[in-house]
Amino acid sequence: MMRFLSMPTAACCCVCVAVVAPAHAEADAPPVATGDSVLTLGKVQAASPLAVGSSARNVFSSVDILGGDLLQDQQVDNTALLLLRAPGVQVTQFKMGVEGGRFSFRGFNGEGRINAVKLLIDGIPSNDNNGAMPYLDAVFPLEIAALEIVRGTNDPCYGLNAIAGSVEVLTRSGGNDGHASVTVGSFGTREVQALQGIEHGGWSQNYFAAWRDSDGYRDHDDARKRAFAGKWFYTDPDARWRAGLSARYYDDAALEAGYLDAATAQSAPRSSPYYARDDRSARQIGQVGLHLDARLSDTVQSSTTLYWNRYQNRRWVRFTAASVQQERDTDETQRGFLSKLSWVPQVDWAESFALEGGVDGQWQDSTSQRYRTVARVRTMPLRDWDFDLHTRGAYVQAVLRPSARLQLVPGYRVDWVGGQFRDLSSGARYPTYAYGTIRQPKLSAVYKLTEQTSAYANIGRSFQIGSGNGAYRTQARNLGPSFNDGWETGVKFVGAQQRWDARVAYWEQRASDEVATIFGVNGSVGTGEVGNVGKTLRRGWDAQLNLHPNERWMLWLAYSRQRALIETPDPSAPMTRGKEIENVPHFLASAGVDWQATSRLKLSAWGNAQGDYYVERSNTLGRYGGYALANLGASWDLGAQREISVQLKNLTDRHYVYVWYDSGSSGQSPGDGRALYVTLSWGW
């Protein structure tokens, strides 16, 4: 029997309680609309009525939707920093050239050892081969209409990379308006963003361009970024179908300040070590999508996306004084599709019923080359890999409402993985491990206790495979996928007249045979991309509160506790039994307030904090990385759709660092000090 069926009794009981609760509740209360587990903060652009798919509101988990008005005016060096406004999300800030940072949640860290979040941009999968999210930086804040964050293992729509959940970036669509902004600020920051929407008849067009140049907080930290995007859609006059093309291009060139030792990071955080003087990086990203949404009948809708992704990255990096400089080159092309069909018939045996199914596939072609270098001149090859990976998946789920208060969502997903790895330096070839059919059952339930309160629970399975050569059979023994079996239960509250809402939740995820990427900082010729971690347990709880008492005020508060433990270690590392996984802080917190002080003046304050973390799995080298940062903002409406705004980041000039440890080496990257930004924006 699959271990999924022997999940903690508490999870099963929560689902069962949601199923049997109507027997008493409906007799004493009038029917009410089914609740959900979603919290929305800010204003969200309405979606096209032809857009099909599992709305986030049908995923009964910790789902958060952030409106574009919370994000579009934010000053950030990389887009991942926008996720600091999301509850329960950890952002790991490398601040090394094009490697600005990554986000994660549910007890996974963002270092890149295990990339556990599926990223989508307007429905297009946007992770690279190892699950990282380089495509995210191609989207600038002004273009974003909303962020949808789904934490949990119960969404069947996505397989590969969706170990802990998914994040979708929705960009602006349609409209006959334009917006532009010009920013100057600390550390030589200069930025321009502009967008234009055009609608006429059934045609809609959207254009976006951005440029950002910065000297950086530290020495040898210059960066220049450019982004361009466009959408072209046509909607049938009878609104029976909609077809369109989307395209995106991004270019980033940056110097790398280098990692510091602990003493220097404390005494001279803005310095750059001598050995990093030749470090730099460059990145190019392209993304094209073809989209078709159709209403096939009164009860059937479909949605299909074809896409092409291209990711090129070149980096020269020396991690420590004792290591050597490396050139790391990546060139990856992805081609894929997603297609789904939903059927919503009229039934007399339930309040409502819907059935949805989908298929998807992705074909990756990647090269990964590494060299030892001196001042960016190659001296010795370290790696010459050429590999392809293809995945296929299918899912089905039902959305059943047997009564006005209860909603059930059973689902099932299967994935298949194949491909071939070629080590060009040795001529060796390897197939992928015989993963077989990767089965992932899911079940969610929500029960509306009162007009203001809904209880929900879910249980589900996700999976992980190795990245790089870690997915291929380079050894005699076959390996299966690592399964993550998770469950969650929570309660959502909605206040009178929807002036406040809140959610509390408890969750767990257990992984079998978890693997993690080896960074290879010492510049040696490595045979493996990943190493075994063992069986792990992640668990925690979240509490969130959003207040919007009137049109002038909006407040939010979120707090998450989490632990990530190794229950059964890799046989070669018995000392890690019962220890914590590296770079996972015990708590994450965020809070903020927006106040429309007058008809023209808006004042804002927001901040985020995280606890310390261990940097390696034996937990013997101390804890680092904790911080609490506060920010202030003010905007003044000049009239005629013009506005000037000011943001003061890291108000108290708090010193904080990102710390890593790998292969006996360690380094620290200081975060930005106090910074001031001034923006002039206007619309038409």
Feature-to-residue mapping (PLM):
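Short, acidic, small-residue-rich periplasmic hinge/interaction motif at the N-terminus
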Residues: 27-72, 293-295
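Extracytoplasmic beta-strand/coil segments of soluble accessory domains associated
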Residues: 47-55, 60, 80-124, 128
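Short acidic/polar hinge/loop motifs at secondary-structure boundaries
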Residues: 124-151, 169-171
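Transmembrane beta-barrel wall of Gram-negative outer-membrane proteins
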Residues: 186-213, 218-257, 280-297, 301, ...
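Membrane-embedded beta-barrel scaffold of Gram-negative outer-membrane proteins
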Residues: 291, 301-317, 448, 454-460, ...
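Gram-negative outer-membrane beta-barrel transporters
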Residues: 341-343, 404-408, 416, 508-510, ...
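Structural signature of Gram-negative outer-membrane beta-barrels, strongest in the C-terminal barrel
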Residues: 344-362, 382-511, 548-550, 560, ...
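C-terminal beta-signal and adjacent terminal beta-strands/loops
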Residues: 609-616, 635-684
